[in-house]
UniProtKB/Swiss-Prot annotation:
Main subcellular location of this protein, as a coarse class: plastid
Domain of life of the native organism: Eukaryota
GO biological process per UniProt: mitochondrial translation
Designated name of the protein: Large ribosomal subunit protein uL2cz
Keyword annotations: Chloroplast, Plastid, Ribonucleoprotein, Ribosomal protein
Listed GO CC annotations: chloroplast; mitochondrial large ribosomal subunit
Keyword presence, Ribosomal protein: yes
Gene3D superfamilies according to UniProt: 2.30.30.30, Nucleic acid-binding proteins, Ribosomal protein L2, domain 3
A Pfam match: Ribosomal_L2_C
InterPro entries: NA-bd_OB-fold, Rib_uL2_dom2, Ribosomal_uL2, Ribosomal_uL2_bac/org-type, Ribosomal_uL2_C, Ribosomal_uL2_CS, Ribosomal_uL2_dom3, Ribosomal_uL2_RNA-bd_dom
Region (Disordered): 1-22, 226-275
The organism of origin for this protein: Chloranthus spicatus
Similarity section: Belongs to the universal ribosomal protein uL2 family.
C-alpha cells in the first residue's frame, strides 16, 4: 500500500507519513475480544517489557496460519487493516462456504484465487509443503511452519520474506529475513510470496499521540535518570555514563550481547546465526 502525506498545516501532519487508508469491517465470527492485562508486567506486577501501556481497544482477528483447507480454491474478498500486526489481512471465501483470514501476500488484489495443497501451482498466496516438486530452489516464501501441523511461525511480519536455498534428505534449508540459515523439515508448509505492506518502515507517526494509540509509552534515556533508577544515571548536567560499556537498567551488558539461551534443541538446525 502507498504512503500518504498530509498537507503541511500543523507540525504533526507536516512530519507524518502514514499508510493509505485501508478500512476494516471484520466478520463477527472471526473476531473476539482480548483482555490486555499487565501492560508489560508479569504476574507479580514487575515490569518485564518496558514502554508498554494504554492504547486503543482491539479486537483480535482469527488468522488461518495452518492453511488446512486442502485443494479447495478460495477467492480474496477484502483486504483489511489489522490492529494487532503491521501486515494487512485478507478475507478468503472458499468454495465449500468456509470463510477465513490470511496474511495479505504482496501484490494480491481483490478477486484473486488462492489454494493450498501438495500439488498446487507456484503462484502468489498458495500454500504447499517444502517437499513439493513444484517448489523450485530460490522460491520466496512466508508464513513458514516449524512444527508440522502447528501453523506458520516464521516470516509473518509486514514485508517479511524467506528464501528456499536447498533440499537434502528430510530437511530443507531456508534463509530467513534475519539472515539466519537453518534447516526445516520438508513436510512443513509455507506460503508462496512476500508479506504485503512492504513500506511499513517508511511510516512516520508524526506525533506522540499517534504512538500512544498503539499502546507504546515514552522511552527515557538512562543517562538522564537518577542513579537509583539506572546505572547510567546521576552526575551534574550532561555527564557520560561513567562506565566502559553501556548496560541495561539491571546492570547487564547492552548493545550486542547475545541473549539466546544455551544448549537449545534447535542449535543443531541453525547453520548460520542471524546477523
Amino acid at each position: 500500500m502507498a504512503i500518504h502525506l498530509y498537507k503541511t498545516s500543523t507540525p504533526s501532519t507536516r512530519n507524518g507519513a502514514v499508510d493509505s487508508q485501508v478500512k476494516s469491517n471484520p466478520r463477527n465470527n472471526l473476531i473476539y475480544g482480548q483482555h490486555h492485562c499487565g501492560k508489560g508486567r508479569n504476574a507479580r506486577g514487575i515490569i518485564t517489557a518496558g514502554h508498554r501501556g494504554g492504547g486503543h481497544k482491539r479486537l483480535y482477528r482469527k488468522i488461518d496460519f495452518r492453511r488446512n483447507e486442502k485443494d479447495i480454491s478460495g477467492r480474496i474478498v477484502t483486504i483489511e487493516y489489522d490492529p494487532n500486526r503491521n501486515a494487512y489481512i485478507c478475507l478468503i471465501h472458499y468454495g465449500d462456504g468456509e470463510k477465513r483470514y490470511i496474511l495479505h501476500p504482496r501484490g494480491a488484489i481483490i478477486g484473486d484465487t488462492i489454494v493450498s495443497g501438495t500439488e498446487v501451482p507456484i503462484s502468489m498466496g498458495n500454500a504447499l509443503p517444502l517437499s513439493a516438486t513444484d517448489m523450485p530452489l530460490g522460491t520466496a516464501i512466508h508464513n513458514i511452519e516449524i512444527t508440522l501441523g502447528k501453523g506458520g511461525q516464521l516470516a509473518r511480519a509486514a514485508g517479511a520474506v524467506a528464501k528456499l536455498i536447498a533440499k537434502e534428505g528430510k530437511s530443507a534449508t531456508l534463509r530467513l529475513p534475519s539472515g539466519e540459515v537453518r534447516l526445516i523439515s520438508k513436510n512443513c508448509s509455507a506460503t508462496v510470496g512476500q508479506v504485503g505492506n512492504v513500506g511499513v518502515n517508511q511510516k512516520s507517526l508524526g506525533r506522540a499521540g499517534s504512538k500512544c494509540w498503539l499502546g507504546k509509552r515514552p522511552v527515557v534515556r538512562g543517562v538522564v535518570m537518577n542513579p537509583v533508577d539506572h546505572p547510567h544515571g546521576g552526575g551534574e548536567g550532561r555527564s557520560p555514563i561513567g562506565r566502559k560499556k553501556p548496560t541495561t537498567p539491571w546492570g547487564y551488558p547492552a548493545l550486542g550481547r547475545r541473549s539466546r539461551k544455551r544448549n537449545k534443541y534447535s542449535d543443531s538446525l541453525i547453520l548460520r546465526r542471524r546477523k
